[in-house]
Amino acid sequence: MGCGGSRADAIEPRYYESWTRETESTWLTYTDSDALPSAAATDSGPEAGGLHAGVLEDGPSSNGVLRPAAPGGIANPEKKMNCGTQCPNSQSLSSGPLTQKQNGLWTTEAKRDAKRMSAREVAISVTENIRQMDRSKRVTKNCIN
């Protein structure tokens, strides 16, 4: 890398906070795939020994209601990434990780579409400005007409 970083720095970001028991317990608390506390009584979740078919961490349950991984739908502020200049887009964690992944994919597709549109616009503007020149470097006529 040109700025003095190594390849390992590009692959694995640095974490500036130290990993403590408090951090570990917070991480474990907010990354469990538990159901919401209000739905735990009616739902046979992991606490009751049952599993939800087709639901990994976040996503719609069998009745179609989204179940966030964090209790009460609160995002963990410690999960936010601080990646400096390596990340062009800041990703918020206002909803669960599944939504974030979908937004990441959508952002990538939107970027691709934007690049395609830009290429088309450039091609159109270039073809409109092509003019035929004779040997004396004078513009004779517009090729589009």
Curated annotation (Swiss-Prot):
It comes from the Eukaryota. A lipid is attached at residue 3 (S-palmitoyl cysteine). Keywords: Cytoplasm, Lipoprotein, Membrane, Myristate, Palmitate, Synapse, Synaptosome. Interacts with CAMK2A. Palmitoylation and myristoylation target the protein to the lipid rafts. Changing residue 2 to A: Abolishes myristoylation. A lipid is attached at residue 2 (N-myristoyl glycine). This is Brain and acute leukemia cytoplasmic protein. The lineage of its organism: Eukaryota, Metazoa, Chordata, Craniata, Vertebrata.
